[in-house]
């Protein structure tokens, strides 16, 4: 049953791609060349089609991910010290007890 769903989706995507593609014109007359492709297919505004990503923002996100891993490992070390040694290791003013 899953195979039939997969085949239906593949066929639908293929047909959609064929419909949206710009047709190849073997015998082009002047009217067809003057009209060109449909505006719905081609970007008529002249802008970029993809969303730009600022480099600084991406670097900050990567840095935040690195920092969260460091913070998590620090908390894990404190918990393990408390768990095995039984000492009163404090995390932000709270004990593990």
Curated annotation (Swiss-Prot):
Stated induction or repression of this protein's expression: Expression is induced during host plant infection.
Residue positions of motif RxLR-dEER: 48-66
Keyword Secreted attributed: yes
Family: Belongs to the RxLR effector family.
Domain remark in the UniProt entry: The RxLR-dEER motif acts to carry the protein into the host cell cytoplasm through binding to cell surface phosphatidylinositol-3-phosphate.
Task of the protein: Effector that is involved in host plant infection. Contributes to virulence during the early infection stage, by inhibiting plant defense responses induced by both PAMP-triggered immunity (PTI) and effector-triggered immunity (ETI).
Protein name: RxLR effector protein CRE10
Organism: Phytophthora infestans (strain T30-4)
